[in-house]
From Swiss-Prot:
Function: Modulator protein affects the P1 c1 repression system.
Taxonomic superkingdom: Viruses
UniProt KW keywords: Activator, Repressor, Transcription, Transcription regulation
Lineage, opening ranks: Viruses, Duplodnaviria, Heunggongvirae, Uroviricota, Caudoviricetes
UniProt name for this protein: Modulator protein
Length: 82
């Protein structure tokens, strides 16, 4: 089965991309909406959250935006430090 990779474009997930834009990384949902990954422009990536039982949109709604902002910032800094 071919994996599909989706760029975040709208809705709740778009807010996560706005947090990531400040650090020059892109947020994508991966594996049929079961994980969030962050990508640098050179293609290097880091899995932010892997939702085993929820879809990405439901998993995102389970946490406050302030909490997501900190998760995105922390992971962007780690990704850019590599």
């Amino acid at each position: 089965m071919k994996k599909r990779y989706y760029t975040v474009k709208h809705g709740t997930l778009r807010a996560l991309q706005e947090f990531a834009d400040k650090h020059n990384v892109e947020v994508r949902r991966e594996g049929g909406s079961k994980a969030l990954r962050m990508y640098r422009p050179d293609g290097k990536w880091r899995t932010v959250v892997d939702f085993k039982t929820n879809s990405v949109p439901q998993g995102v709604r389970d946490r406050a935006f302030e909490e997501w902002e900190q998760i995105i910032i922390d992971n962007a800094l780690l990704l850019n430090a590599d």
